Design a protein with these regions (language model features):
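Transmembrane beta-strand segments that form the barrel wall of outer-membrane beta-barrel proteins
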Residues: 250-263, 280-293, 314-326, 352-362
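Auxiliary, metal-adjacent structural segments of Zn-dependent hydrolase domains
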Residues: 1-44, 62-73
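Residues that define the transmembrane beta-barrel architecture of outer-membrane proteins
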Residues: 234-239, 264-270, 294-300, 332-342, ...
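C-terminal membrane-associated helical module and adjoining short loops/tails
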Residues: 143-277
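Hydrophobic alpha-helical membrane-anchor/signal-helix detector
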Residues: 20-59, 99-125, 131-147, 226-242
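Metalloprotease/metallohydrolase-associated module, dominated by Zn2+-dependent proteases
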Residues: 79-183
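Outer-membrane beta-barrel "beta-signal"
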Residues: 272-274, 303, 344, 365-379
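Small-residue-rich helix-interface/hinge motifs
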Residues: 34-94
Length: 379
């Protein structure tokens, strides 16, 4: 999941002091500096964001290139490029659910990383300085989403089109993520070629300006920007990854939570993550509220994490979900479709090595971090 683990463990070793407060301060300052530097490098936050975009395209055998691999320090625009117009036409016209997800997959990837790091800090007692990354990743998404409907993006898109000229391979696959996402939500059947000719006269005009959005689409985008502030509601973000709930003769019981607002191919998922640890078990629960334009749907999730077996050498994790989501991932329907997901992962300790096997199966539906919207079994 990016550089979260290695970066934090190294910082922990380098910043040890006699004062606990000073130790925490130095560790988080060092982590913040590293995260800022790594933003424009492979395996950093920006790279991860673009790779989740690319994963959706790769799912449909579309080639692309992540410009974060070129170390673009200081650039305001970093692209996923070398994507042909023909491939975007194919994706939009034949796999419209994937096309809508493509636009917001980078946003999904960053919150998926945050959730994974929060789980590791909570259940594995890692005590890693992740707070700077949590805030940096969360706030970049909040600011990006809230600015997407502003008129300033009209100027930026005009400048980008002029700079890229007739070279199709130099163009980003979509431009502003969220304007293209919301336009595709409100007009799912609009042919991709209806975007018209690129201002240079070569290729399709890929980028959607805020000024091109309908009034309803622009209002919806603003609403999602306001809801995105829900992502800061977690004690993880203020330095309390574990809260002691009670102590017994058997040991301590801990809990924590996180609220998430995630964008989806049909609208959004507003969910509450519950972290719970007993002396012998690690539990994770989530309550999902899926929303399209006018209807709400619901889901439940539960997981047992790293259950120790065979003298603690075998670790077993299971996860299950059940949900109702909009039928066919539609933004407009009020008809629900029932779905489910189940996964199991087992690892065995051989010295310092922990080889593992994992299987995940799901029905049709959207699950954060799973690239497949249709039914699938992954190994």
């Amino acid at each position: 999941k990016g550089l979260g683990g290695p970066r934090a463990r190294g910082i922990n070793k380098l910043t040890k002091t006699k004062s606990e407060f000073t130790d925490i301060l130095f560790r988080n300052l060092a982590a913040a500096g590293f995260d800022l530097f790594a933003f424009y490098t492979p395996l950093g936050i920006g790279w991860l964001h673009e790779e989740y975009h690319r994963a959706v395209m790769t799912r449909r055998k579309i080639n692309s290139f992540n410009d974060m691999n070129t170390f673009p320090f200081g650039q305001s625009l970093v692209y996923v490029r070398k994507v042909t117009d023909e491939n975007l036409i194919m994706l939009s016209d034949n796999y419209n659910n994937d096309f809508r997800r493509l636009m917001i997959a980078g946003n999904e990837g960053q919150f998926h990383q945050i959730q994974t790091m929060q789980k590791n800090n909570f259940y594995l007692n890692q005590d890693l300085p992740n707070i700077p990354l949590y805030w940096m990743s969360t706030m970049t998404n909040i600011i990006y989403l809230n600015q997407s409907g502003d008129d300033i993006f009209n100027e930026r898109i005009d400048e980008a089109n002029a700079k890229e000229g007739t070279d199709i391979s130099s163009r980003d696959f979509t431009g502003a993520d969220f304007t293209t996402w919301v336009d595709a939500l409100f007009f799912p059947d609009k042919p991709y070629t209806d975007r018209g000719l690129h201002p240079s006269g070569v290729g399709i005009n890929r980028y959607i300006k805020p000024s091109q959005l309908s009034g309803e689409a622009r209002s919806y985008l603003k609403k999602q920007g306001n809801l995105h502030w829900l992502n800061i509601l977690s004690p993880h973000l203020v330095g309390f990854p574990k809260i002691k709930l009670k102590s017994t003769e058997n040991g301590n019981y801990y809990g924590s939570f996180a609220v998430r607002h995630l964008l989806t191919p049909f609208g959004n998922d507003i969910n509450l993550d519950i972290f719970y640890q007993t002396p012998k078990h690690n539990f994770f629960f989530a309550f999902h509220n899926y929303n399209n334009l006018n209807s709400s749907f619901f889901g439940l999730e539960g997981a047992l994490i790293d259950k120790k077996l065979l003298d603690d050498k075998l670790l077993l994790s299971t996860r299950a979900m059940i949900w109702t989501q909009p039928k066919n991932q539609s933004f407009f329907t009020n008809i629900a479709s029932i779905g489910a997901m189940f996964s199991i992962c087992s690892s065995y300790a051989i010295g310092h090595w922990h080889p593992y096997i994992a299987i995940e199966g799901k029905t049709n539906g959207w699950v954060m971090g799973n690239v497949f919207l249709e039914k699938n079994i992954s190994f």
